[in-house]
Amino acid sequence: DFEIVLTVPGVTQVQPLGLSVTAEIAEKFPDLRKSNSIICDADKLEGSLVVRCRRPGDRFSPSGVAGSKKIKEYFIDQKIDRERREFIPLFCDKNEIFWVGNYRQNQMSQPGPATKRCLRLTINKLSDEENIKNDEK
């Protein structure tokens, strides 16, 4: 069980998953559709942003779907293996899960015509060298 506060802007290491998360702020980003990256309306996110593992009863509101859904049900619908579910990062603000890492963003956090500041989050695997350095600490 882990919860790590993201450095915004900056790079945050998520050791339990062997990942790093890069957070960048700008007025606009090119709309690059990649599963390891999302663009959010930075002003719609409240409080500290965290990355964490799933917890019993977690819910989120996937974009394009009316209402909310349990994370467990979302994983089942997406046919994500049970063993893999523990390794999927969940990105949250103080109110809700806004991104199921590498899968789906929620409706609320998406940028729109009135967006003034964008936040781009990108997930990368830590290299073996970075993992060795961190194990030595």
Where do the model's predicted regions map?
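AMP-forming adenylation/ATP pyrophosphatase catalytic core
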Residues: D1-K137
